[in-house]
Design a protein with these regions (language model features):
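P-loop NTP-binding core
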Residues: 1-253
């Protein structure tokens, strides 16, 4: 099985959209874990995170269990998050002698790994403690790359964090690849950015997925339905692209 973090230093790059739709598109049993206090993945799966009593935060601090926190849907199982997760740093400061601050998520999930074929972690747009926990718990990382000017500089920041986490805490951590997102077919800039990204990351021995996710207004509207976009707009071209990306992931060695 694989534990895959969807990680980016920058918001608005399709990170949560990618996490939610991959969780639905992948074959087998999938768990989506939200580690972003904004709660957008939870909203996309039909819940109001602000009304959730049990979340990833309560699991991490031992106030709830996996079984009474996980929410089971027809698309995937998921563990929600809300703004309470922003308080985790303070909890750790107050309990630094009792809790390992970088292995909390791994320690919480480890006994449930065998229940799933894939665990997808939606990271916050930062390289702080929440993202480090996600990387320590992961086998692989997928990095969304928005096809716009200077996008690669933000990707390099998260790559640095991944390599540092690999060095210090998780020696088997691997970058599965970079997925180009929000590709605007109406402009030449997206094509130029993608071409340069493929050349640049090839030199770093980092895979760029063959699948490119196009910019799609409908996908931005999908969270209002409480369903993954691929389960709302069944025949849309972008839906086919997410299934193609899922196939690439399933064939990854």
């Amino acid at each position: 099985m694989k534990v895959i973090s969807i990680a980016s230093r920058k918001g608005g790059v399709g990170k949560t959209t990618t996490a939610v739709n991959l969780a639905s598109a992948l074959s087998g049993k999938v768990l989506l874990v939200e580690m972003d206090p904004q709660g957008n993945a939870s909203i996309s799966l039909g819940t109001n995170p602000d009304l959730m009593k049990n979340t990833i935060f309560t699991m991490l601090i031992g106030e709830s269990t996996f079984d009474n926190t996980v929410i089971r849907t027809e698309y995937c199982d998921f563990i929600p998050a809300n703004d309470d997760l922003s308080d985790l740093d303070m909890i750790l400061i107050l309990n630094k002698d009792k809790i390992n601050p970088v292995t909390m998520l791994h320690d919480t999930l480890v006994s449930h790994l065998s229940e799933y074929d894939y665990i997808i972690i939606d990271c916050p747009p930062s390289k702080g403690l929440l993202t480090i926990n996600a990387l320590v718990a992961s086998t692989d990382v997928i990095i969304p790359l928005q096809c716009e000017f200077l996008a690669a500089s933000g990707v390099n920041k998260i790559i640095e964090a991944i390599y540092k986490t690999k060095e210090l805490y998780n020696p088997t951590l691997s970058i599965m690849g970079i997925v180009p997102t929000i590709y605007d077919t109406r402009t030449s800039l997206s094509g130029l950015v993608l071409q340069e990204a493929r050349r640049y990351f090839l030199q770093q021995n980092i895979k760029v997925f063959d699948t490119t996710i196009y910019k799609c207004v409908r996908f931005a509207e999908a969270p209002m339905s409480g369903k993954p976009a691929i389960d709302v707009y069944h025949d849309h071209e972008t839906v086919k692209l997410y299934y193609k990306l899922a196939k690439e992931i399933e064939e990854y060695e």
